Amino acid sequence: MKLNPFALTLAPLLAAGAFSAHAGPQAHVVCAYHHTLGDDAIMMFGKPNQAMWHDFFGNTHTDAVSTYQTLRDQPETTCDNKADSSAYWAPSLRLPDGTVVKPAYQKTYYQASNVDAWPLHPFPAGLSLLAGDHHGSAPNPHITFLCANGKGYTTKTGEVCGLRKANDAVQFNIGIQFPNCWDGVNLKPAHGLINATYDVKGQCPSTFPVKIPTVNMNIAYVLPTISSLDTSKVQLSMDPIMHGDEREERWGSLYTAHADFMNGWTEDAARFMTDLCMNRGLDCGTTVPYGYSRAKANVWLSSLEPDLSQPEPQVLLVQDNWQNGGRTKNSETLSLVKFHIPPLPAGQDPSQFTYRVRIYGGKVETNGADQIFFYPASNDWD
């Protein structure tokens, strides 16, 4: 069996799982709703309570002065992967009867296409993205709506949602697809300046050459107090008219849907997501680690040739033949791998993290099953 490469990862316990090679290049997180503020640290930095009402997910400290550094300095998150302290936010939603409701959670898929031809780059520290149009008045191909009892996502409003399958609530989702081609210069958009755009069949334009994972955010509203919802009459918060410190609220149709993303992934996690997961066509699910290190040395040894060692970077051979005489008649090949051990996160409960060895590779033979065993060993070799 050939394996390529080896990595030692520091993973939150909630991120246990195995890679899938069948769902395409992606990873995901689920983040519960946490708080609502009239803040926007991307477009109205340093101006608390002057933006539209926003519902915040992920980092629990997000406010009008949040930056990548504050997200990492205060990494507490509602997301199910502690490597992700990103801030996600979207405008508050008002029902036709005037009731402002809170979302239940948001699930974000990080996805990509055509990575063989145009591979991904990791999110840079400090990157912020916008998606949607807060002045929108018509369907947007990057904004979709879903009734959980309906026929799937649509870009148009007007569907009337009924009770979902469990018959316990109306569930209404808003999907927001963020741009995935960064200009490589501006970490934040600004009024009159976009810092990212969308690819075309996986390829980024020359003016926005840096391809990053597509952030597909899906916000779920679970509404147990109603039995139907006319989406043409649902509204979203818009920027208020300010009279000194007093707010005059404004509301717009669902076509004003938009969202903000401020990257708060650890740098190791962002790099792992692209380099060792999505660029290899893998579905990492929630197993993107908090930190990781590649093998810094490796060698394989044969029992029939004890004086022969074969260092071969990036490729390790593991072999143990039990057929035709078993171990006494067949060579055994042992691989030794040396790692730098990623440190535990400062200030966080160490019991919430565990170390794992991750491998990527496959069988050389077409038949039979394989088992791989890992044991600690001395590190006085090179």
Residue spans of the language-model regions?
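Primary mode marks residue(s) on the alpha4-beta5-alpha5 output face of response regulator receiver
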Residues: 24-51, 55-176, 184-288
